């Protein structure tokens, strides 16, 4: 049976070392929809640059992603493990630039750091140092999550997504109440 639903787009942001986790986030979002979409009247849409961006020329690649995806999404799930990513000319990495844009727009950014063991052969010392510096700065200004295994990430996300959806619904309700109160004030002034 059809139902009305508010749709929130969730941008999945991470450097390239977390492909399995990116898929797990997509699965967690689909699982959330299967369990909660009807009761909450909310549908979550996973968005990734590799599936939702459009090729564009004569534009900085991250700028195209920012315009096409970052500006259009409602929630960001950002993850890091062994690296920060590639400098964009504006920020330390594409993921960092996406997070910065979300925070500047006042939109929720849920950040997670993987504690999964690292194969020494995969370590890029420069990237690891950049990640540690970013992590240290982030801990000063944000409450972040962590996860070890992919299953743990899915489990944590199921709880965090519910809390985030309820916060967004509450914020939307508050905006609606504020608009009604403002309209009532205008009507009162017009009657004077």
Regions found by a protein language model. Name each.
Residues 57-61, 82-104, 123:
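Conserved TIR/SEFIR loop-to-helix hotspot centered on a Trp-containing motif
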Residues 115-192:
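C-terminal interaction surface of TIR/SEFIR-family domains
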């Amino acid at each position: 049976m059809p139902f009305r639903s508010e749709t929130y787009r969730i941008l999945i942001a991470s450097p390239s070392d977390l492909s399995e986790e990116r898929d797990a986030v997509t699965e967690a979002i689909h699982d959330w929809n299967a369990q909660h979409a009807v009761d909450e009247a909310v549908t979550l849409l996973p968005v990734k640059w590799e599936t939702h961006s459009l090729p564009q020329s004569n534009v900085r690649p991250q700028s195209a992603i920012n315009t096409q995806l970052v500006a259009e999404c409602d929630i960001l799930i950002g993850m890091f493990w062994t690296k920060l990513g590639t400098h964009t000319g504006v920020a330390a990495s594409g993921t960092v630039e996406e997070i910065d844009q979300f925070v500047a727009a006042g939109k929720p950014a849920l950040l997670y750091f993987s504690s999964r063991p690292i194969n020494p052969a995969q370590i890029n010392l420069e990237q690891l140092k950049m990640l540690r510096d970013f992590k240290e700065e982030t801990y000063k200004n944000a409450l972040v999550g962590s996860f070890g295994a992919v299953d743990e990430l899915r489990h944590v996300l199921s709880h965090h997504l519910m809390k985030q959806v309820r916060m967004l619904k509450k914020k939307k309700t508050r905006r609606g109440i504020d608009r009604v109160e403002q309209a009532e004030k205008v009507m009162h002034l017009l009657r004077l």
